[in-house]
Amino acid sequence: MTVHPPLALEAPPERLPGEPDRTRASGPTLYARLVLHALATALTGAVTAPLWPIFLASVLVWGWPPTAPAPAQIVRYLRLAVTATPPAPGLPVGVRAWIVVSVLKRAFTAPVFGLAWQLDELLYGRALDETPVVAPLFEVSAARSGSTQLARYLEEDPRLVAPSFLQASFPYLWLWRLAPATVGRFVTAEQVRHAIASRLPPEFLQRHEGDPFRTDTFEASLFMMHLNHLSPSLGPDVMIEDFSFAVIAPHNRQLWERTFVDLLDRVGRKTLRYAGPLPDGSPRRLFVKGHFLGACDAVAARFPDARFLAMARDPVARLQSAVNYIRANPIETSLGAPPWGWLGAALAENEASYCEVEQAWFSRADGPRRCVVRFADYVRDLEGTMRVVYRACFDEDAPPPTVPKTHPPRERTNYLLNRPLHLLGVDEAALSSRVRAYHEWCGA
């Protein structure tokens, strides 16, 4: 195993003048919120208790659903909440208690989300098994690489169909079919967009142009269904293991190589079935965007004719954006954001590892069909870049007319959170040295 020099500097200050207050809750505020959190969790446990016998019976028929955290992960996170010893500012008792309650609440909801998944198996299981997934396209790129914008362009190809953010978050075909005939009669798509945006902090909205009805990072829903989203609150060591998209820790192998692939497979078939064929009767092709590099071999084994597409971008710029983005992300809003130093240390290691694995995986001689486009080329020549993508992934010389050929004007944003790397606790010189080969490979 290669030992790399540390990429983290001393912990930076938690708040600078002019920054929004994202510091972790403490004192009376934390404990008041904790009491409410515990009461809500106890109520959730009481309400869902009668569902457990039905849920466990369904597990005997269809197996453990990918929408519910595995018992082993629940036990692990309860143990970590008590025993984890991250660096300063550490884990106060109130924060540990908050994490314990959050884990229990997620465990108590397992029958709800699990039975919602199993209902699809009861109603549509055979039809889904018979739904073909032919030559799917998977865009697998590092976070903050420009991959979401590229995915939105590809979505304009009517032959492709991608699960939207809402579909990935609520992956139940029966619900997709029920919603338009019920809630959809009274609530418009624009009202849904506004309702979701109003719950997100402005510093997050500045960095992520989300649309619940369009494609987004697919595995984000996996993290929220399970417990990985809590890892940043447990310190950098836990985050390095459980918030990594490239290097799979031994205890996460089942999650990524089996649970994730099953989720991807089933949601893909549901998406194809829900969308239906093209007007001429020809089938659509599945398209999924994410960062699931560590699972690519397992995905390729499930879909041998798949195409894999990556956007390669300067990792230093990506990391600076990623740390600010995660700090702004309302993962546990009432608890507050993880400390800057933890985020910088964990994401620097994960970013460097991602670069190493991505370069190796997309460069090796064997494996599935792959295509890499450089961010610099993508920005400078979108039309030429899309031609490269379509030749490699579609065996066509050019995309259809519906796919954009030029970038729309982009407004520059004065970010509310926009720290440089040295104020994120990251040693930029050490990072640049470690990713030098990748930097040359991606043409940054």
Features from the language model and the residues they span:
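Glycine-rich phosphate-binding P-loop
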Residues: E139-D157
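Short His-Asn-centered micro-motif
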Residues: V140-A142, F287-H291, A312-R313, F375
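Conserved phosphate-donor/acceptor-positioning beta-strand/loop module used by diverse small-molecule
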Residues: V299-N324
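PAPS-dependent sulfation machinery
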Residues: S169-L286
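PAPS-dependent sulfotransferases, especially Golgi type II membrane carbohydrate sulfotransferases
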Residues: T2-V112, H251-Q254, G268, L286, ...
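Post-Walker A helix-loop "phosphate-sensing" segment adjacent to the P-loop in P-loop NTPases
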Residues: D157-L166
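Phosphate-binding P-loop
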Residues: L128-V134
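N-terminal pre-Walker A segment at the start of P-loop NTPase domains
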Residues: K105-A127
